[in-house]
Amino acid sequence: MAEVRDRNLPHQVQVHPQYRLDNTTGGGYGAKNYHSGPSTSQVLAVLTLLPIGGTLLALAGLTLAGTVIGLMLATPLFIIFSPVLVPAAIAIAMAVTGFLSSGAFGLTGLSSLSYVLNRLRYATGTEQLDLDHAKRRVQDMTEYVGQKTKEVGQKIENKAHEGQVGRT
């Protein structure tokens, strides 16, 4: 038997609705309502889209008919001129392929050469040496300008001092 403390615990209840399979009712999963017809918006949608769909279907039929007639007229010409057309098409295709492949090989060669030169430049460190050389030159130029500024200042000071000594 169940004890008293088990009776006070809340229980969870799961509800599973059951649907009828005869589909005559208005509710439930998969139920269809046979008593009412299509809505007004559905009727308007069908009436609007029916002429558009029919027109597109007619255009597709005309395109198919034109294609079949064109093939019927062109097939004898293709058969008669095939000894000339097939080799000409093959020659044109080979020429186009040759131009495209030569361009691709040229680009591949240029990119490979660029890659190798960049790798050699980084391996020998010429880029780092160039940067160090540029830094050293800027530093030397700064020192030179500072030295010249001091010399010019001393010359001006000496001339000013000579001018004062000559007056007295």
Curated annotation (Swiss-Prot):
Q: Where is this region: Polar?
A: 2-45
Q: Which UniProt keywords apply?
A: Acetylation, Lipid droplet, Membrane, Transmembrane, Transmembrane helix
Give the residue spans that cross the bilayer.
43-63, 76-96, 97-117
Gene Ontology cellular-component terms for this entry are: membrane; monolayer-surrounded lipid storage body
Could you tell me which residues carry N-acetylalanine?
A: 2
Give me any GO biological process, just one: seed oilbody biogenesis
Q: Which protein is depicted?
A: Oleosin 18.2 kDa
Q: Which organism is it from?
A: Gossypium hirsutum (Upland cotton)
Q: List the lineage, top down.
A: Eukaryota, Viridiplantae, Streptophyta, Embryophyta, Tracheophyta
